[in-house]
Amino acid sequence: MGQCYYNETIGFFYNNSGKELSLHWRPKDVVVVALGLTVSVLVLLTNLLVIAAIASNRRFHQPIYYLLGNLAAADLFAGMAYLFLMFHTGPRTARLSIKGWFLRQGLLDTSLTASVATLLAIAVERHRSVMAVQLHSRLPRGRVVTLIVGVWAAALGLGLLPAHFWHCLCDLDSCSRMVPLFSRSYLAAWALSSLLVFLLMVAVYTRIFFYVRRRVERMAEHVSCHPRYRETTLSLVKTVVIILGAFVVCWTPGQVVLLLDGLDCKSCNVLAVEKYFLLLAEANSLVNAVVYSCRDAEMRRTFRRLLCCMCLRWSSHKSARYSASAQTGASTRIMLPENGRPLMDSTL
């Protein structure tokens, strides 16, 4: 191991990797920050709504909904991490210390890893409940807690590794171009692990699809309700396509550029698209709320109830303020007497 550069500036590592460090706000930086702030706020609001719905509705106190709540918590964390990134990017990157830079990246890596790992946990739990022919699985709560703790332990482990071990501060030749303080091998490992998660999800949902299709076909042999059979099959196909399609669209571009950078592809212009692909990966935290929660009819009813309650509270608060203001105004409408008779305000 060569010399270590713990006391160097962020600019030193960016220059070493050949990544431009902005000293002023460029149009590209403004566009990325504007889009990033918009996506982050939407992610925070939607996932807060999901968590509130699961907490307030006792029907959702089931293992699969605990996992959905954990997914919403991971995506909420991802929204906050990306919001933190947006306030420490562009020209502000150069002012970060090495510890601050690792904190910025660690928050993002931890939250996104937790989100991806929870997606796999949900797929496995759905597979288990379908094979057991249960609408809501009877998975023990202790096992769910263990699963959730395992997800966050793995996410924290992967998020903290670069700051403590898997960096390039002592080996500048191994530095990544996209993430100049990270080792290229870390990026390759992270991309391959995400790809492995996707392949496992494909395998799990494919097995669910064929199992349910065979079961419905056997039922259709004894019932003449063939349109219902086709409807069930098409609904299942739609669900699987949406789940896997959302993951592919949001994650594949980012995984590809991470892998290319990790493999040290000199001819690949990964820096031209990295910010937009990271934004697309963050958008998955918004898509998850729609795909996994909003398609549930009971969840939608709970959303409407919560939003109606919020609107009613806001309206009642506004009405109370208006009434208080009106009473105050009425008490000041009596004018000074003139010729022995009190004058009333002409606005009455």
UniProtKB/Swiss-Prot annotation:
Key words, A-Z: Cell membrane, G-protein coupled receptor, Glycoprotein, Lipoprotein, Membrane, Palmitate, Receptor, Transducer, Transmembrane, Transmembrane helix
Say if the entry is tagged with keyword Nuclease. Answer: no
S-palmitoyl cysteine: lipidated where?
Answer: C308
One GO cellular-component annotation of the UniProt record comes to: glutamatergic synapse
**Glycosylation-annotated residues:** N7, N15
Asked if Cell membrane is a keyword of the record, the answer is: yes
Q: What is this protein called?
A: Lysophosphatidic acid receptor 2
* Positions occupied by motif PDZ-binding: 345-348
Q: What interactions and quaternary structure are annotated?
A: Interacts with SLC9A3R2/NHERF2, MAGI3 and PLCB3. Interacts with RALA and GRK2.
The record lists the lineage as:
Eukaryota, Metazoa, Chordata, Craniata, Vertebrata
Positions of disulphide bridges: none
Its primary localisation, in coarse terms, equals other
